[in-house]
Regions:
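Active-site loop/oxyanion-hole signature of alpha/beta-hydrolase fold enzymes
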Residues: 9-11, 49-96, 246
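Catalytic histidine-centered segment of alpha/beta-hydrolase-like enzymes
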Residues: 232-245
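Gly/Ala-rich beta-loop-alpha elbow adjacent to hydrolase catalytic centers
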Residues: 97, 101, 105
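Flexible "cap/lid" loop of the alpha/beta hydrolase fold
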Residues: 106-111, 115-147
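Conserved alpha/beta-hydrolase catalytic His-Asp/Glu region
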Residues: 130-136, 144-197
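Conserved HGGG/HGGXW glycine-rich cap/lid loop of the alpha/beta-hydrolase fold
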Residues: 9-65
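Conserved serine/cysteine hydrolase catalytic core
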Residues: 174-230, 237
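Conserved catalytic-core motifs of eukaryotic protein kinase domains, centered on the activation segment
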Residues: 37-39, 64-70, 130-133, 215-216
Length: 252
């Protein structure tokens, strides 16, 4: 396990790492998740062997610290991720990023383009104030006090089911709520616009069971390769890992 300070006050973002050839692959998890749980089985596949691999837990999640005075906006998470990559000596990384982690990865690539050579985005959040879907956590519908102090966190853990709750319960409730609020608020310009403007190689995976990706044609016109993953919902890495592995390996 390695760590890097991210807030100037001693709080650390942490990751586990496997040695290998550059460029490094960096796996970034979604809201209430953890990198190794969602990605270790992907990185372990023979098609992806031999590359330096980092499994990063964002602030407030997994093994990383969760300071109460941190903002947890997408930009804050991106800066913390940059601190981890700087400490690790990583540049021109390939980021494999899921959901909220995909939004963070887009912001990172915009703010620190030298750190990112390729984005493999798995149902990344692209737009602010998205419509509420079945299976969403609903965290942002609570005030911070309701969520942290008045039972909101427990209700959400019951709602999301045992698999998501298994990692969500490891996240700090206050950090989780602020992260959810930051995700709903998004960025200015939007994550979608930032993604369209990037020059790095970009792949976006959309689970077929999640429906059509909004404004897919505009993304493709901007050079983003959009892949619909058969038989998969939001968690492509569990529903159809073969497609994700092939895309990460660049063998499609």
């Amino acid at each position: 396990m390695r760590q890097a300070e991210f807030d100037g006050k001693g709080s650390c973002i942490r990751w586990t790492e496997a040695t290998g050839a550059e460029p490094a692959r960096v796996y970034v998890h979604g809201l209430g998740s953890a990198s190794t749980v969602y990605n270790a089985h992907i990185a372990a596949r023979s098609e992806l062997a031999g590359r330096r691999t980092l499994f990063v837990d964002l602030p407030g999640h997994g093994i990383s610290d969760r300071p109460a005075d941190f903002g947890y906006a997408l930009e804050d998470h991106a800066d913390a991720l940059a601190a981890a990559l700087d400490e690790a000596g990583v540049t021109a990384a390939e980021l494999v990023a899921h959901s909220m982690g995909g939004a963070v990865a887009i912001v990172l690539a915009h703010r620190r383009p030298e750190l990112v050579s390729r984005l493999v985005l798995v149902e990344a959040n692209l737009d602010p104030y998205p419509p509420v879907k079945a299976g969403s956590s609903g965290i942002a519908s609570y005030t911070e006090e309701e969520y942290v102090e008045n039972g909101g966190h427990a209700r959400v853990l019951d709602k999301v089911g045992p698999s998501w709750a298994a990692t969500m319960r490891l996240a700090d409730p206050r950090a989780l709520h602020r992260t959810a609020i930051g995700l709903v608020r998004g960025t200015v310009p939007t994550m979608r616009h930032l993604l369209e403007e990037l020059t790095a190689d970009r792949v976006y995976l959309q689970g077929a069971l999640s429906g059509e990706l909004v404004n897919r044609e505009e993304l493709e016109a901007a050079g983003v390769r959009v892949v619909t993953v058969p038989g998969a919902g939001h968690n492509v890495m569990f529903d159809n890992p073969d497609v994700l592995v092939a895309e990460v390996a660049g063998k499609v």
